[in-house]
């Protein structure tokens, strides 16, 4: 079995690539980072260090690496004979990898098994987004029906904290021991790919939102409030009583929204929240608040980790989610030198009236239940 994985970074090597390797796939990593690809191509193996109560090291072997910018034809050939294609490149980069996947699909032999395509990104419906981009990249003569006959597109929810790495580690990577890879089984019609580390479910939507609006919302809240409190790492931040109280309040609101919207069990969500907070406390995972907090404009987007659950809360629970609004205020004050989105956000705060920021950055229009509360939050952040 063979899997082509786009994104040879820390998540690609330490999460998706590791699980595919353990499932018995030969993994072909594809990336535009020439230095990283050269290092992987020169390595016979790399280690994944799992840190938690105990530290376990797993070794990945039998992989190859291709530069997707300079070896596209070779990559097309790999996709043409692959069983699985996965990505961990970021939702905004999917449009750049779609054309080569489309070429690979077009090169598959007649009668070849359908290629399993899964975008493993921190976004709702990421594989749907990739599939839509693939349609635009189809070769002349290809049709949507032909594409559907060649591939199975399955949405996923992925969860593993992968901090910034020590440059001296080379291609080795340190990650938390916990992971979750949930896959929508409905496109497979009972023929799910053999990936023991993945959990196939009938209804993925609640799993994706549970993860994004608990792990990602909690992680970002810890980062932004911890940054304002002078904490350097996530574990240091969550150890501060004021930060912990803020994060707990935020996650109680996201859980209330998840329960009201999807009917998730409140007691199970409480256990899930406790598990997430313990992950944030992991002292062996040196995860800087600046890494987690970067790209605040994206994280303040309409369907992302703050405005998404806040909107659901207003719609399904009723009222304004005060803790989530406070977290938005902390995100607005994330002023990090060297982060382009942070700089752009601070520029907007200096030059744009509050309603404009709520509409342009957060995607919330006048008349929405959240509009006026968010305007007040922005106005406070502007001083």
Curated annotation (Swiss-Prot):
Residues given in the record as NAD(+) binding sites: 3-14
Cited InterPro entries: 6-PGluconate_DH-like_C_sf, 6PGD_dom2, Mannitol_1_phos_5_DH, Mannitol_DH, Mannitol_DH_C, Mannitol_DH_N, NAD(P)-bd_dom_sf
Gene Ontology terms: cellular component: cytosol
Single Gene Ontology BP annotation: mannitol catabolic process
Name under which the protein is recorded: Mannitol-1-phosphate 5-dehydrogenase
Keywords: NAD, Oxidoreductase
S-S pairs: none
Pfam families named among the record's database cross-references: Mannitol_dh, Mannitol_dh_C
Catalytic activity: D-mannitol 1-phosphate + NAD(+) = beta-D-fructose 6-phosphate + NADH + H(+)
Enzyme class: oxidoreductase
């Amino acid at each position: 079995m063979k899997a082509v994985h786009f994104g040879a970074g820390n998540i690609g090597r330490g999460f998706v690539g590791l699980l595919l390797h353990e499932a018995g796939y030969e993994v072909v990593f594809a990336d535009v980072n020439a230095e990283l690809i050269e290092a992987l191509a020169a390595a016979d193996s790399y280690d994944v260090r799992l840190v938690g109560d105990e530290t376990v090291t797993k070794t990945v072997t039998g992989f190859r690496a291709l530069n997707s910018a300079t070896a596209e034809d070779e990559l097309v050939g790999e996709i043409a004979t692959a069983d699985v294609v996965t990505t961990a490149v970021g939702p905004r980069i999917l449009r750049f990898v779609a054309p080569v996947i489309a070429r690979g699909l077009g090169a598959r032999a007649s009668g070849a098994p359908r290629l399993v395509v899964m975008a493993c990104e921190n976004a709702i419906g990421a594989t749907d987004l990739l599939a839509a981009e693939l349609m635009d990249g189809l070769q002349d003569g290809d049709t949507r029906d032909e594409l559907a006959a060649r591939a199975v597109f399955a949405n996923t929810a992925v969860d593993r904290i992968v901090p910034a790495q020590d440059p001296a580690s080379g291609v080795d990577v340190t990650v938390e021991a916990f992971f979750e890879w949930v896959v929508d089984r409905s496109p497979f019609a009972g023929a799910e790919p053999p990936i023991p580390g993945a959990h196939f479910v009938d209804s993925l939507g609640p799993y994706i939102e549970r993860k994004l609006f608990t792990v990602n919302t909690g992680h970002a809240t810890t980062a932004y409030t911890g940054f304002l409190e002078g904490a350097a790492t996530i574990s240091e931040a969550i150890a501060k009583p004021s930060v912990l109280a803020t994060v707990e309040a935020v996650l109680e609101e996201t859980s209330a929204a998840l329960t009201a919207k999807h009917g998730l069990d409140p007691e199970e969500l409480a256990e899930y929240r406790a598990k997430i907070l313990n992950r944030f406390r992991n002292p062996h995972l040196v995860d800087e608040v600046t890494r987690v907090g970067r790209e605040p404009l994206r994280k303040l987007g309409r369907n992302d980790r703050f405005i998404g659950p806040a909107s659901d809360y207003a719609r399904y629970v009723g009222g304004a989610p005060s803790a989530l609004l406070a977290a938005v205020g902390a995100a607005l004050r994330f002023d990090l030198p060297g982060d382009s989105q942070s700089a752009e956000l601070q520029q907007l705060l200096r030059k744009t009236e509050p309603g404009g920021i709520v509409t342009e950055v957060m995607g919330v229009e006048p008349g929405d239940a959240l509009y006026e509360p968010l305007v007040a939050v922005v106005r406070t952040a502007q001083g």
